[in-house]
A protein has these predicted regions:
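Cysteine-centered metal-binding/redox modules
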Residues: 1-212
């Protein structure tokens, strides 16, 4: 707790005082969990009413570049970070609190492809943040110029050519997927900040997005 308090107050000077409580007793956790879920659900519900056309700025995150140097996560009202931990409101708050931090604003620019979700501002940002590895990104397509994946993604969306469809596998699933590969092997080829056609890391909440 003391380490977290030191981290938050040193990284975010706007926080003057903070207290942290860890609950490890099962009875107490069961008691507090419903309220925590209510808070998270209210946050997610608020975001579901917001569309990419309603805002002028997206947000980017490069927290994972330590192990995926060419990865840059683009966060929009209709696309969460791959890890599922950062939505558009979270990105906005983090950027305002620490403008020089790993989460930053991205002017969305011109909408180049409404079906696939290509924006000039996102293209320019990923070209810079990926060290020139790629210069185009489709925010809502798994083909041609798909969004890169780090390694922290909640799940993988993968193409199944035999039925011309997509499957989704959660990172906690330990069995084989319908294509005969477990999550661990699929993650190895999907991660690393590469654009891999037909295989994208994603947040589970993204399934609710109209752009999915």
């Amino acid at each position: 707790g003391d380490m977290l308090i030191f981290l938050y107050t040193s990284e975010l000077p706007v926080i003057e005082k903070i207290s942290i409580t860890f609950h490890t007793e099962e009875k107490k956790v069961v008691e507090l969990l419903p309220h925590a879920l209510e808070v998270y659900n209210a946050r997610d519900e608020r975001l579901r009413g917001l569309k990419e056309g309603d805002v002028e700025e997206f947000y980017g995150c490069v927290l994972c570049q330590s192990f995926a140097p060419t990865h840059c996560c683009i966060i929009t009202p209709e696309r969460l970070a791959n890890c599922g931990a950062i939505n558009w409101f979270d990105g906005r708050a983090a950027y305002k609190l620490d403008p020089e931090g790993p989460i930053f604003g991205i002017p969305k620019g011109e909408l180049l492809d409404p079906a696939r979700g290509e924006y000039s501002g996102a293209n320019q940002e990923v070209a810079e943040r990926s060290l020139g590895a790629y210069d185009r990104v489709y925010l809502h397509s798994a083909f041609e110029h798909p969004h890169t994946s780090c390694g922290c993604f909640q799940s993988i969306c993968f193409y199944i050519p035999e039925v011309d469809a997509f499957g989704i596998v959660h990172r906690d699933f330990v069995g084989e997927t319908v294509v005969g590969l477990p999550f661990s092997r699929m993650a190895g080829t999907t991660s690393g900040g590469k654009q891999v056609e037909g295989s994208c890391g994603m947040a589970l909440e993204l399934i609710r997005s109209p752009k999915f």
